[in-house]
Regions:
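ABC ATP-binding cassette signature C-motif
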Residues: 1-255, 305-556
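A short, surface-exposed helix-loop junction/capping segment
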Residues: 109-119, 263-271, 300
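Intracellular alpha-helical coupling/juxtamembrane segments of multi-pass membrane proteins
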Residues: 243-276, 280-284, 290-297
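Proline-centered turn/helix-capping motifs that create local helix->coil transitions or kinks
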Residues: 277-279, 289-299, 393, 532-540
Length: 556
């Protein structure tokens, strides 16, 4: 069954074409990842499919029996309404019953609770209410009577995600789910739960995400928007990389062939008289096609860049018996650690356990309650925070980067200009003269990252650097960090990114306890799951023994 049929879709942003004449079908059961650089039309394509934007040309047909549900990066709410009212603003009796029940339980009014229970029973809503409870619990959504306007950015995203999941669980059989970066603002446990949830829900899915493990878990086909075209690849992310590399190799060979032909045809064109025969006119038309092919550029995001890092001395950072609390929240309880040269440490823990506070304490931004943080004299921190790009006045991208430095020194003794450095990180010459206010969220994140790297730090502290970055930018950043000789302290919900870059983990277990685990995130999760399985089996054996003992006592 075709859920969606698209023919000849074209859309531009101002004078910039996003995609031109693309066609595709989405069929029942498809699970598709849509990837591309920021600013080339991923979110726009989703909005066209949902009917929130119109194409300039082409058709988009949704099957009449298909119910479309969309999760957007910028959630829309009734701001003065409560979380409950926003979650359940549906007209169906079952949704109303659940909404009334949740509000009654929050109010603790016995009459309201009794009436809401009767309404739940009349509408057979208990099974669905149980599913709703699971969604809210797993996404850490509490205080349902709080106005949405009081929520933080991360809380808003989680409420929006919960609303989306409630909708797909409630809607009839044929559901098409469109999701735009659903893992942003989720911790690692939430992401793993969401993977399992989407696998269980038999929905047809079109997903935009930079989280490669998430893509591999919930999709089986990758579409890429590139140079105004849409390319499709069956299989997982690794297969996509292989197939794309083969395609680019073929395209480069084709361009080289066109360049050779172009040189010959250019010589012929110069020798031709102005009056053309029909045959020469045809050859002339073909010349312009060959010229366009020969001048085509294929982007290569492979980065080889050895920075001239600020020298690291023998002493890095020493933490001695560090304590920090905020009221009842204990962030650090006697933390001791001596950092070594070239260490790459990943930080793992639930939202709200104090990971960002820990990073601030190491840099001296926040003071501990007791204990000492001794930082080596040669340490130059480069801190990527979640606060985003900070600028006092609007200016062009290249002007902004030059306020930090004019040149980027290389280990070879040379240097890169600000323009060259920007281009390495996928800011084209045209984009370099764009005003900061006109950049997308992902482009601002990328520029924020560049300003930190441009300062030549020898100790990088990266707090969720992958949020809002596209996959091509992530590939460039990963390669840069793999070649980086300094220390790296990384907080990220991107497990692929973490696995590729870190040597060991600081596990924030809560109540101020930090455990040092010698391995990457995937290895840690495998160990944790094996412990849980062992504990479960041991519990079952213990229960069986107790039951057997009881039977022996009862049976004469």
């Amino acid at each position: 069954m075709h859920y969606v049929s698209v023919e000849g879709l074209t859309k531009s942003y101002g004078i910039t074409p996003l995609f031109k004449g693309i066609s595709f079908n989405i069929n029942e059961g498809d699970r598709i990842a849509l990837i591309a650089r920021n600013g080339v039309g991923k979110s726009t394509l989703l909005r066209i499919l949902s009917g929130k934007e119109q194409p300039e040309a082409g058709t988009c047909k949704i099957h009449k029996d298909v119910h479309l549900v969309m999760f957007e990066q910028e959630p829309q709410f009734i701001e003065n309404a409560t979380v409950t009212q926003n979650l359940f603003n549906q007209e169906h009796p079952t949704m109303k019953a659940i909404s009334n029940y949740e509000m009654a339980m929050e109010s603790e009014d016995e009459d309201l609770i009794t009436n809401s229970i009767m309404e739940m029973e009349e509408n057979n809503a208990w099974d669905f209410e149980s599913k709703v409870k699971t969604i809210l619990t797993q996404l850490n959504i509490h205080h349902l009577e709080q106005p949405v306007s009081k929520l933080s950015g991360g809380q808003r995203k989680r409420v929006s995600l919960a609303k989306t999941l409630i909708q797909i669980g409630f809607e009839p059989k044929h559901v098409l789910l469109l999701m735009d970066e659903p893992t942003n603002h989720l911790d690692l446990n939430m992401i793993e739960w969401l993977e399992n949830y989407l696998e269980q829900e038999k929905v047809t899915l079109l997903l935009v995400s930079h989280d490669r493990y998430f893509l591999e878990a919930v999709t089986d086909e990758i579409w890429e928007l590139e140079r105004e075209k849409l390319y499709s690849y069956k299989g997982d992310y690794e297969n996509y990389l292989e197939k794309k590399a083969a395609r680019i190799e073929s395209e480069l060979a084709s361009i080289d062939k066109a360049k050779n032909t172009f040189r010959k045809e250019l010589e012929w064109m110069r020798k031709q008289p102005k009056a053309r025969t029909t045959k020469s006119k045809s050859r002339q038309d073909n010349f312009y096609e060959v010229e366009a092919k020969a001048k085509q550029k294929i982007d290569d995001t492979n980065l080889q860049l050895e920075m001239k890092m600020t020298r690291l001395g023998g002493k890095i950072i020493e933490a001695k018996k560090v304590y920090k609390s905020y009221g009842d929240l204990v962030v650090l309880k006697g933390f001791d650690y001596t950092f070594s040269k070239g260490e790459r440490i990943g930080i793992v823990g639930k939202n709200g356990v104090g990971k960002s506070t820990f990073l601030q304490i190491l840099q001296g931004i926040t003071q501990p309650d007791s204990g000492k943080i001794n930082v080596g004299e040669t340490i130059v921190f480069g801190h990527f925070s979640q606060e985003g790009l900070v600028y006092k006045k609007d200016m062009r991208v290249i002007e902004y980067l030059k306020t930090f430095a004019e040149q980027f020194p290389l280990a070879s003794g040379g240097s890169l200009s600000a323009a060259q450095f920007l281009e390495l990180f996928l800011f084209t010459p045209d984009k370099q003269y764009t005003y900061l206010s006109a950049l997308s969220g992902g482009e601002k994140k990328r520029l924020q990252l560049l300003t930190i790297l441009f300062k030549n730090p020898n100790f990088l502290i990266l707090d969720e650097p992958t949020n809002d970055l596209d996959l091509p930018t992530l590939a460039v950043l990963e390669q840069f960090l793999l070649d980086y000789a300094g220390c790296v302290l990384l907080v990220s919900h991107d497990r692929y990114f973490m696995d590729k870059l870190v040597d060991h983990l600081f596990i924030f277990e809560g109540d101020g306890v930090i455990r040092d685990y010698p391995g990457n995130y995937t290895q840690f999760r495998i160990l944790e799951k094996s412990k849980q399985s062992y504990a479960s089996v041991s519990s079952d054996i213990s229960t069986s023994k107790e039951s057997a003992t009881v039977v022996e006592k009862i049976v004469p």
